[in-house]
Every structure is written in structure tokens, then in C-alpha cells.
Amino acid sequence: MATYFVGDIQGCLDELLLLLERVEFNREKDQLWLTGDLVARGPKSLETLRFVKSLGNAAVTILGNHDLHLLAVSQGISRVKEKDKTAPIFTAPDSEELLTWLRHQPLLAVHSEYDIVMTHAGISPQWNMATAIDCAREVESVLLSDKWVLLLENMYENYPDTWDVTLSGIDRYRYIINAFTRMRFCHLDGRLDMECKLPPQDINSDELVPWFELENRLPLSHKVIFGHWAALMGHDGNNVIALDTGCVWGEYMTMYRVDDGKYFTQKAIEQ
């Protein structure tokens, strides 16, 4: 049995299938862990959802910001973004089944054997593992309740930007969602910055640092594997591995076999 982690697919199914073929992935005994954002700008978002769902227990996937946006669009809360290729999902005969399946996916998954925690964007530097897990399960329970549409209606804000155990209601849920699915940089005092999307090397300010480099970040018992931030181009350090390497932007898709620490890459196919 082998366990593979792969960065954001964003509808780039062909590249994923090539990687799985290269490593001779066997759904009967291997596992594929996906860092979220199954859908968005790639050409096969619908097919990607169908494929990952078809893997059953052989796949572990989590919710990314594009996945949550897809759910919001399905409820008329937001519109399909101009460059997204997700419209076919809403007219597919299995649309409701796929969207319900997606809504049942977690924000955080733990691989106990290898002491790895996987989220889409990372873990708030103000959380330890116990808090991160509790916060993920808290929002996941709302997504599975009759309040899920209300939650998605109110997630599109950048505040609150700092964690406080006294946060409650939609403010609390919004911080949790932003930390797990949108976070990149933090201010030196731990506040989340939701505006800057530059590569870290292009930042001129001393006030912003990647969330995983914050000096007073709480220590975690597990290594964090995440996607979301293509500009990191596969950063491996600070007890984190960033697996989004910009396939949807014409770069490549990265897969990591945790059993032996080997990486596999697939160049983006020209569309």
C-alpha cells in the first residue's frame, strides 16, 4: 500500500491521470490524498469531481476555497467566476449528487501513521493541533446542517483577521474558513492578511510573512501538507510541504509519495 498526496487539481484531470498511471496507482490498495480545489479554471472540473468521488475510500480530499465557492454558486449566492470552467457541473444529470458529496468533505484530514495533517491553505499560526481539529469539525458540522446555506452566504469577508476563543457565530466560522482555505500571509502579530498573493520573495514589507514562517507560530505535532499557494512552487521546510505548483497556470502538478518521500511531477498539458 502506498499513500500519495497531490496538489490542487482545479479541473486538470488529464495531468492527474498521467501521474496516477506513472506511479501505477492501485485503487484497491493505495490511497490518494488531495489538497482541495478539485474544481475551477481547468477544463475538466465536472470530470474531476466524478473521478475523485468514484475512488471511494481510496481518496481523501478536503475543501478548498474554490470548492466552497462552487457550493455557493449552486445556491445562487455567488456567480461563476469569469475564468472558471465549472458551469457544466450545474447542468450535469448527477449535479446534485456531486455537490452533496463535495459538501460532505472535511476541511482537515489527519494521517495518523505518518503524523501528517492536510488542509487546503494551512493552519492558523494561532492554533495548535487540537484547536485546528476542533475548529475544522465545528464548521464541517454546520456544512452538514440546515444552516449550511446561511454559512456560505456570510463567508465572503476578510474579517475577523485574528483568532480569539471568544469568537462566536458567523465571525468564528468565517475566521476558520479563511484560515483553512484562503490564508497565505500573516502580519507579525499573527493577524491574517487576505489581500497579498505575491510570492514571498517579492514582498518588500517587513510586516508580512508566510503563515508557516511566523516566529511566534504555535508548534504543531504534525507536518502540514497543503495546496492553495502556487507561488510557493513546492516549498518543503518549516515542517510543511506545499504541493500546489501551478498546473492550472501552465506549470506542473506535483505528487508526493509519503512512504519513501519521493516526488513526481507532470507538466501542464497545453489547452
Curated annotation (Swiss-Prot):
<protein>
    <recommendedName>
        <fullName>Bis(5'-nucleosyl)-tetraphosphatase, symmetrical</fullName>
        <ecNumber>3.6.1.41</ecNumber>
    </recommendedName>
</protein>
<dbReference type="GO" id="GO:0008803">
    <property type="term" value="F:bis(5'-nucleosyl)-tetraphosphatase (symmetrical) activity"/>
</dbReference>
<keyword id="KW-0378">Hydrolase</keyword>
<comment type="function">
    <text>Hydrolyzes diadenosine 5',5'''-P1,P4-tetraphosphate to yield ADP.</text>
</comment>
<dbReference type="Pfam" id="PF00149">
    <property type="entry name" value="Metallophos"/>
</dbReference>
<dbReference type="InterPro" id="IPR004617">
    <property type="entry name" value="ApaH"/>
</dbReference>
<dbReference type="InterPro" id="IPR029052">
    <property type="entry name" value="Metallo-depent_PP-like"/>
</dbReference>
<dbReference type="InterPro" id="IPR004843">
    <property type="entry name" value="Calcineurin-like_PHP_ApaH"/>
</dbReference>
<comment type="similarity">
    <text>Belongs to the Ap4A hydrolase family.</text>
</comment>
